Amino acid sequence: MQFSSLSLVFLAVIGAIANPIAVDSELENRDVQLSKYGGECNLKTNACRYTKGGKSVFVPCGTAANKRCKSDRHHCEYDEHHKRVDCQTPV
């Protein structure tokens, strides 16, 4: 009787160790969300300017017609996690 109850407890512990709580993926998702920066487009230089840590950072937008800045001071977004800039984001 004791052997069967101990074996059930042992199996439950092994299952908990084998399937850890998905905290790492939640932290990774949070990091991805925190790595997005909003900024403004500069039509003359075709670059997105955003502020990171109190400093202005310039990232060039794409050269294709659907990747360029729409207008001066248009909202743009830089995703530092994926290293992508979106100069066509809707306001």
UniProtKB/Swiss-Prot annotation:
Disulfide topology: C41-C69, C48-C76, C61-C87
GO cellular component, one term: host cell cytoplasm
Domain of life where this protein originates: Eukaryota
Protein's UniProt keywords contain Mitochondrion: no
BP GO annotations: defense response to fungus; killing of cells of another organism
Compartment list: Secreted; Host cytoplasm
Coiled-coil segments: none
Leader peptide range in chain numbering: 1-18
Annotated function: Antifungal protein; part of the gene cluster that mediates the biosynthesis of oxopyrrolidines, polyketide-amino acid hybrid compounds with feature structures of tetramic acid. Acts as an inhibitor of growth of various molds and yeasts.
Family statement drawn from the similarity comment of this UniProt entry: Belongs to the antifungal protein pafB family.
Name this polypeptide is given: Antifungal protein opdH
Origin species: Penicillium oxalicum (strain 114-2 / CGMCC 5302) (Penicillium decumbens)
Gene: opdH
